[in-house]
Structures are given as C-alpha cells and as structure tokens.
Amino acid sequence: MEAMSPQQDALGAQPGRSSSLTGMSRIAGGPGTKKKMKTLAERRRSAPSLILDKALQKRPSTRDSHSASIDTCAFLSSFMCSSRTLLIDGPVELKRGLQRQERHLFLFNDLFVSAKIKYNNNFKIKNKVKLADMWTASCVDEVGEGNTNALKSFVLGWPTVNFVATFSSPEQKDKWLSLLQRYIALEKEKDYPKSIPLKIFAKDIGNCAYFKTISVMNSDTASEVINMSLQMLGITGSERDYQLWVNSGKEAAPYPLIGHEYPYGIKMSHLRDTALLTQGSKDSASPSQLQEPFLMEQLPREMQCQFILKPTRLATAQQLSDSSHKTYKRRRSIINWAFWRGSSTHLDNLPVSPTSPMPGQLFGVSLPDICENDNLPKPILDMLSFLNQKGPLTKGIFRQSANMKSCRELKEKLNSGIEVHLDCESIFVIASVLKDFLRNIPESIFSSDLYDHWVCVMDQGNDEEKINTIQRLLDQLPRANVVFLRYLFGVLHNIEQHSLSNQMTAFNLAVCIAPSILWPPASSSPELENEFTKKVSLLIQFLIENCCRIFGEEITSLLGELSERSDREHTPDTSCFQLNDSSYDSLENELNEDADAPCSDLVKRLGQGSRSMDSVLTLSDYDLEPPEAEGLLTLSNFDLDQSKEEHIRTKQPLETKPVSVFVAYRKVSLGEHTRAPDGPGTPSCLPATASDARKVFRRHRRSSEPSIDYLDAKLSYLREFYQKKLRKSSCDAVLSRKDEDYLKQTQPQKKGDQRCFKQSSVTGTDVSKRNTANENIKKKSLSGHEGIQETPFTKSKPVAISVASYMSSQDHSWEQPFEADACRFSPPHIADAQKSSRAHRRCSEPSIDDQNYKLSYLRGVYSKKQSKTSCEAGLLHGEEDYLKRHKSLQMEGQKLINQSLVMGIEVGKSSSSTNQSTEKVLPPRLNLCPRASYSSLSSPGTSPSGSSVSSQDSAFSQISEHSVFTPTETSSPIDCTFRAQRKQEELSSDCDSPSLVSGMPGPSTGQASSHLAYLRKGTTEQLPQMHSVTLHPSTWLRSGLVTLKNWSLKKKTKAARPEDRKDCSLKEPLELPACAAGTPEADSLQESQEDIHLGVDEGAGQTACGLSSYACQDSEQHASSPFCLAGSRLTLGMKLHEGEESGGQYPCDNPWEGAPSGLETSEDAANTGVEPATVCNDGDRH
C-alpha cells in the first residue's frame, strides 16, 4: 500500500470523491488519518443506505464496483441453470401495513427471489417463490398504510401475503410490472392440472349449506371463486358483500383475500410445502392427478389449507383483529395512541380500537340514541356495577391489559343485544370493553367541540373556579352524557378510595382512562396534541378527586343501590363464577337454606357479584358447618381416624355393637362434664382419643380458611340456633337426649349400688393383656372373650359393654379415684365399638331404624331389671333357657368325670393330647353360648400321671375368683378343714395373682383384687347343711391328701358304672383349657403335684372327685347393666370328714343333702377391705 500507481494517486487526491465509493482511505492527512476517517464515515451511514446508494447510482467502473458485481455473480450462481435466466434485478421498498422493508429483488424466467442486503455486499435470501404462484394488482391503498406514491408502486404478492412494492422511478415500476405479468402468465400455462377441487366453508351465513366443493382453475381469482361459491351455496347477493378467507399453517390467524389472489396457487403451494405432492409428468393420467389435491384431507387439521366465506361486515371486524394488519396497528396504538385521531387523515374512517366491531346496537352510537328517557342501557349499568364491586379489590384495574379474544367476543355479544353474565368474565376484560365503549362514542363523551374549553379548565386559579367551570361545561353536554359521567366517576372514585390495595391512585386512573374520554380534533399538530393530552389527564384526575363536589354526594349511594340490586338479580341463577370454591359454595348454600341463621343477613349483603377472595375469607371466619357437623363437634372424644384393622372390624353388623349409643351420649352431653368434680376437660379423666378429636374433626377444611376455638366461641354462639337443626338432621343427638333423661332418673339407684359395683371382681377386659391360653381358647369360641370381633352376636345378646368400660364412660363423675383408673385404662374393644358406630355413616347421622331399635330394647332391659336385685340387672330375656343349658351341661360333665374314674390312668396319659384336641373339636351344643366357658376337673387322686393337676391348673386359670364348690354325685369326701397357718401362707402367696380372673385380666392388680362375687342364698332345707369355708385350689389339694387314701378304699365297694358310659365319655371330649404359664397357681400346683403322685400310688386310682366348673355369664352379657355378675362358678361335691384325727368317713348317699358347699376363692379381707363371701345354694340358681 505504500507504493501507489499514478491513477490511484489521482483518484485519491480528488477532494470531492467519497471514500465510501472509492474504497480508498488515502486523503489529506496521512495514511493513519485517512483510515480513521473511513471508519467514521461508515459509522455515520447505515449499511443498507450505503449499499442502496451504490445500487441506484451509475458509477464509473472502479475496483469497488467490480467487486460488487463479483458478489452478485457469486450469489446468482446458486440459482442459475440451463433453462433459467435472470431477467432483471434491483432494489425495492416493500411495505406491509405500517412495516417497511428494504429488499433487493431478482426476477428469473420461472422464479422470484427476494434478498436482504448486508453491509459487506452480501445477500441473505428472504423469499423464493415460483412465478406460477404469484400475483400482481393495483389496489395499493388496501394493502399498505400511510402515504404511498401510486406512480412508483404496485401490489406484489404470493401465498399468502401482499406487499406494496415501491421502486425508484415510475419507469422502474412499469418495467417490473410488465415483466412480472408476462412471465406469470407463461408459467401458469405450464401448470398441470389446470383445475383442482376446492372446498369452501360458509361461516356466519344463515340458511345455507355448511360447505361446498367447487372446481377452481389456476387462473381464477378470489373474487371469481366467491361468485361461484355463492351460486353453489344458494346465497343471494354480490361478491362485494362477502369475503374469502384462507386458513393455512403458515400464519396463526386466518388471512383475508382482497380479491386478486389465486386460490389455486395458494393450495398448490401449500401442498408442495408439505411434500405430499410429487412432481408428475404431463403424460400421466388425468384422474390420478385430479385426486392429488384430495391428499389435503389426509393432513392434520392444523396443517390443512381451508377457505372460508364470510360476510363483508364481519370479515372487516375480523380483519382488524386476526389478520396480519392487526400486529402493526396494535404496535402503533401502543406507541402513540394519544395522537391517533389527528396524526393522519386516512385513519379517520377506521374504528379507533383495534378490537372494536362495526357500529351496531351499542358501540359507535351516540349516548342520546341508546339511552331511553336518559336511562343508560342495562349492559352498561351491569358493567359499571360489576366494576364498582370488584374494581376496588383488583390490583391494576384499568391498567392491566385483557385478553383480546375475550374482549372481542364480549363486545360482539353486547353489540348484538345478547344477554351476558358478567360474572363469567374477567374484570380486566370488562374494564377494557368499557374503555372501548367510551372511545367509540362519536365526538367523545366530553364533546370534541368543547375540547378547548375543557383543556383550559386546569388554567383556572383555585379549585372553586375549576369546579364552577366544569359544572358549566357539563350543562352544555347532552343529559345522557352527564348521567353516564355520574356513574363513571362514582366508580373511579370508589376505586381511588382503595388505592392502597389496588395501587390505582387518581393520577394512575386518569392516565389510563383520559384518552378514552376526550381527544383533540384532527387539525391539531403532534406537539399540541402531546401538551393537550397532559392537560386532559390532569383534568380527569381533578374530576376523580372532587367528583362528590361536582356531581353531588348522592353518587355514592347511587352506586350502593346498584350493587345491592345487582346482587339480588345475579345471586340465585349464576353458577359460573370464576372464584368457584367447593368449601365456599357449600358454606354459602347452607347459609342460604337456613333463613333464620345468625349469619344469613351477612350472606344477603355479600351477593354473587361480590364474591371476591376477601369475601371468601370473611365468610370462612364464621366457620359455620352444616347441621350434621354439630353432632361431630359434640362427639369430640371419638377417635375418627381408624386404622385398617379397626376399619375391618367396623364391617360387622350394627346390631353387634349397640354400645356406641351410650358412649355417644356421654360425649354429646358436654354439660355433664361440667358437673364432674374436676370440671370439663380434666386430663386425667379424658381418654386418649379425646385430645386428637379436635384435630381430626377439621380434616376436610381448606388450609387457607382460618380456624377458631369452636368449643368456646362457636359452640356458645351457635348452640341455641342449631338445637332445632339437630332434631331434624342428627339422630344421635335426639336419641341421646332421651337416654340422658332416663339415666338421670336411674342415677340414685346407681349411686346406691356404687359400693357393690366397686367390689365386682371384673372391671373390664383388656384385649392387649390377654395371655396365651386365652388366645387359644378364643379361636374355638368356648371361652372366647374376644369373640366380639370375630363372631356376630346372637339375638339374645345385642349389647357389648363390659363393666369397666361402662363405668369409665358413664360413672366417672361418681367416684374420683375410680374415675381416674377407669379412664386411664380404657378397654380397646370399647374404642372399637365407638369407631364402628361411625363406619358406614356420613358425618354423625346413624341408621335411624337400627339405633332406635337398640335404644328401645335397652330401655326395656333396664326397666325389667331395675325391680330385681341390682347385681342381676344385666341378665337378658333368655336367662332361664341359658341356665337350663348350664344344668344339663353340668350333669354331662359329672357323667364324664365318672367315666374318667373308671379309666383313671388312661385318661391321665391322654390328658395332654385332650387339651389340644378339645380346642379343635367342640361339642355342637357348646356353640350355642360362645361367650360362656366350661371346664371339668378330674379328681386329684385318680391320675397318677399328674393329669388331674394339669386339669386343675388349667381349670383354675379359667375360672374367676367367684367359685362355689357344691356337692355332686361323685364328689370326693375330702376334708375341708385346714390349718390356720397353712391357710395364711397359701392365701398370701396365691391370692395376689391377677390371673385368678379367668380370661379377664383387669387393668391393674389393684383392680383385680377389689371385687367380690354376689351369690344367691339357698333354700331353708340346705342352709343347715352348708357352711362357709374360704378355700383356694392349691390349699384344697394339699389338705385333701390326708383323707385321700381312706376315701378311695371305701369307694372300691361301690358298683362301677356300665361300660356304655365309657363309650359316651369318649364321644364327648372335655374341654381342658391350658393354664397360663408363669402364674402363681401354676407354681403352687406344681409343688402339690408330688404329693398327689404319692397319694395315687397308695390308693385306688379308679375313684375321683368330680369337679365341674362353668361360667354362667359372659362379661359382654352383664355389660347391659351397671353391674357385672360373677363370670363363672365352680361346683364341687364333697363329703366332709368329721375329724381329721379320727380318720372316719362321712357317708353321703344323696349328694345334694348334707354335703357342705365350698365357697369361692377370694383375696384376704384384710388386704382388700371387702366383706366375706356369702353362701348360696347352687341348686337354687338352677
């Protein structure tokens, strides 16, 4: 670069030569300065204008122009082929709507290319179209906007767009137009097939077919296709009244065709773009080619090219919103919307809003024409009322933009007179439509003729003068305009009062709504329009802040009346409110049903139109529940969360657990907790489930809804009102109230029996503490104390209550010490009964028939048993039959014992196997009373192998402490006189075990040792022969060894039983329950086993003492009354010896006469503080 040719030096020395054209950087100032100046020059001038300069100016052939031509040749080389020639190329300005683009066009004999010029003389291809698919027209004003020189421009288009092409000169324009028309026609002659079927859909046209398929030639324009479609569809009118739209996958919205386009070229181009139509030869069969356009039906709907015929009026409105023109118009409205009406004259004939329809019944009509007797139309009043209710609670109201499609649909409905439910619309859509309605009022609502006067208002001195001037101007407006302004500024004032929440101050509202209220005339300049717009905004702000002084104070009350009236009209039948919430709806529906509810007036004030989120939260603070929920509130101690095991139990029939009625009553009656010594809610008196009830109760409430103390505030507030609701919707509460009165009457009798009740040996059953022996027995249901969960009850036992559970749930207020114990050890099966009562019911509503039957039956049982002894109050209707079965079973047990005396050693050897087999094979008659337990004991002196000891051990583990030994036919004459020292030792060591209560361990050892059995007294004939002896099984065994030998020898003389009795004993196996291991009885009996072996070795092993034990009543049977009888009795026939020293025998021929009866085993009276047991004759019971 340092050495330069003379020619380059001369060119560089020319002072007027532009460096951009020569490309030289050598000007005056040295090489570094010249290079720097070139860079600055390129920065000042944009790249497109620089290249356009080079393209339009004729320059001498220099190195730069040569390089540019090289770049063009390099670009064109990719399009050139043997049959394609370049006809012309040159720069052009393409305009579409408000958008202008600089392009460089290349026209070939069959192809049209549009490229974008880059700053480095390169081209970027933007469009490449076949000439057969192109069209030209002269309707420049319909395609482009703004000032367009028609002498240098024409319309150029291809699927599916139209542009206004402007050239540098009219000569260039004519040259391009002639070449395009000529070669487009030549290419169309090459099209094959010349015609294709085209499906035309009719939309918004009544009384015509939905679509028709017509045959379209490749040279038919859109206008010609409209004429053919009208004839095929049977529509009268000219093609000017209708417009053809095309919906293709290239553009998101349907595109309107002006009339000069070729529908044939649009559809064929679409097929080529989808690559479904291959290039066919002209010699192919015509029918196959005609079927190719039908491949369009195989495309997805979004890819199909559809042609739609619409009326011109609706098409015009659709064009403003959905066509490609919409984008550019919206862009302009956002930038300089304040100057629309005065910026250019060509926009005056178009609607101001891009979504406004053509003038109809509402929009675009002056207010005096649509207001009858100066009353606003109902749609306008509805929108104002809706905005007055929801606007103050909406952030950014009148500022945030709305969905344009929703706005257009709402406007079309309002403009056509269709009734609209505004509750289904967004509040932003309604605000946008209201502003659009204001913008479409001819000459504005403030009147454009008074524009100068309105602008000068803010130039007044003080506020009073401004107000007076405004009022004078308002008097000059039509009355309908003033009425509308009163409502409008009342709404704006209400929104401004809540500006802290919605962030819309008077200034913000004025900026958003001022352009829709007043705009400058068309003759104003942009500078004046900008200044006037600011003054109009200040004027609207002043009107909002002083609307009460300008329009009067009554505008506030007027809006209030509108709000209430709208609520009454829309609340009953509106079901599509957007803030739809299931909990909210159910709450308000319940309040609407209860016209006399305490909060019903609140619901009347908060109508359907005012269902904002704040109103939802306000109503949820009341937290009112349906009437059924009140029963759940009072039943707060129920454990509503059930485990899977408990849920399985609840599937039993309801009649198996009627105890839930009593438990429900105790929980419903909150007042009785108050009468308790410790007051309500004492932690030591409430079961474990009571603390979780409040948490479980509200499990269906929404997390957003606040919760209040419903036991204190809400119950005290609503209890009086919901008393009558309980009578018609909650059967539990009604039936429980009747039982409350009944139990109050029987409460003195319960208090009288309190002492006897405390002495009961059975205080409840604890399923979790049952031993292994009882679990085995439970499987066969003979002594199954847990049978309530596995076997349904019979008809004679509908009540499932143990004494402990009954006392803990109802009588905890009688005795505080016992109350604490009972509540602390609440039986689990009672909790199961509570849960099962709510298994198949919603809320607290039970099955009315079942519960009514249960309560009626329980009342009858109570009334019958109150007249009897208090300890016998729990017996049911079938007691006589039940005791007869016991008598017969007792006799059978005695007969089996007689057979065991004959089989002595054999029975002893098979005793272990018998214990196992009896659990599997049960006598059928024993299943009649599954809750009772039966056990038979062999004599302690008949089994050398110790089977009698194991039998006695298991028997004494099954029976309770209330055992009565009575004589039988085969009773052993064992002496029952014991030494005082041995008696004290045995009782002190054995009577402390809780296992003495067979199958029913108490909650604690203290409870197990604090009960006494009540025995009936015998007849006068037997009393002289009876005497009471405190007896324990282990003590009885040890003392009986003394007389065992003599008794067995004398028994040999008696005749043996027949052999057939032996067979009967084998057919009817005895139930020998297993004894719980590890109990004190087992230890003591084990010690006495050796002594028994010695006695057996000495004496005869064929004689035995028949021991028969059975439990006459189950704990579940006795639970129907407040008392529990002895669960089982042990009868023992014995013949007492007159003296241990003499060794004589006391003969007994009749076992029922003269045989003394042993008494039940019990604890030491000194330890338990319980009265000694009384003697009763067992025969009297039977």
Curated annotation (Swiss-Prot):
Tissues/organs with expression: Highest expression is found in testis. Ubiquitously expressed in extragonadal tissues.
Site (Arginine finger): 399
PH domain mapped to chain residues: 86-187
Pfam families tied to this protein: RA (PF00788), RHG20_PH (PF22286), RhoGAP (PF00620)
Annotated Low complexity bias: 933-953
Skewed-composition ranges (Polar residues): 757-775
Keywords: GTPase activation, Phosphoprotein
Organism: Rattus norvegicus
PANTHER family attached to this UniProt entry: RHO GTPASE-ACTIVATING PROTEIN 20, T-CELL ACTIVATION RHO GTPASE ACTIVATING PROTEIN-RELATED
Functional note: GTPase activator for the Rho-type GTPases by converting them to an inactive GDP-bound state.
Every Rho-GAP domain range: 365-551
Keyword Iron in record: no
InterPro entries (alphabetical): ARHGAP20-like_RhoGAP, ARHGAP20_PH, ARHGAP20_RA, PH-like_dom_sf, PH_domain, RA_dom, Rho_GTPase_activation_prot, RhoGAP_dom
Protein name, UniProt field: Rho GTPase-activating protein 20
GO MF terms, alphabetically ordered: GTPase activator activity; small GTPase binding
Keyword presence, Phosphoprotein: yes
SMART domains named in the record: PH, RhoGAP
Positions of region (Disordered): 1-40, 744-791, 932-953, 981-1009, 1140-1182
Gene3D superfamilies: Pleckstrin-homology domain (PH domain)/Phosphotyrosine-binding domain (PTB), Rho GTPase activation protein
BP term (GO), one: regulation of Rho protein signal transduction
Post-translational modification Phosphoserine, affected residues: 46, 704, 730
PROSITE patterns given in the database record: RA, RHOGAP
Domain Ras-associating: 194-283
CDD domains referenced in this protein's UniProt entry, alphabetically: PH_RARhoGAP, RA_RHG20, RhoGAP_ARHGAP20
